[in-house]
């Protein structure tokens, strides 16, 4: 049937609109998740020289936004320095700073969703090493200068690492867990045994013999135990 000029004009405009949408639609879809689409800027390195005791604060950030940071508070000057890892190393800390432990004059920062543990100098805040290829690390516990345990989310293993060489040396299998449902969290040590709470969708404490790196006992507790401390 004959459409005339009006029909042809409408057909032409529809085709043109399709071309426009093809170009702007990816931009529109990207806007709600701008954090996932943006590129993280890198800064120039700054020099720090912390003196005396201080307080480190890990700022978790937003999951999947890669905006975790590290702050430092100096009690003597009552001054807070924010983003010290970023400023000292000219790179972002990563996605979800879960915890930090101090051992042998180094700060060990566990970055959960970046699958890494960073070791930093406590005075300059500069990175001196890192442990990579972790599943979803939560906490690190030092058994000795050459052995540490790293708990994981979504894994049925606790990783054994060598802090001197920054490498994975083995695994502790957690009974009754699957890779998709496994979860181990905080750790405390009493004598030769390390006790670890099993958090997400779990209800147990595990007892690990540090001489054999094996689970030797377990205790059923309430649902999702989040933390534990040692009564000295």
Which residues fall in each region the model found?
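Sec-dependent bacterial lipoprotein signal peptides
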Residues: 1-35
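Predominantly soluble domains enriched in secretory-pathway, periplasmic, or organellar proteins
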Residues: 37-232
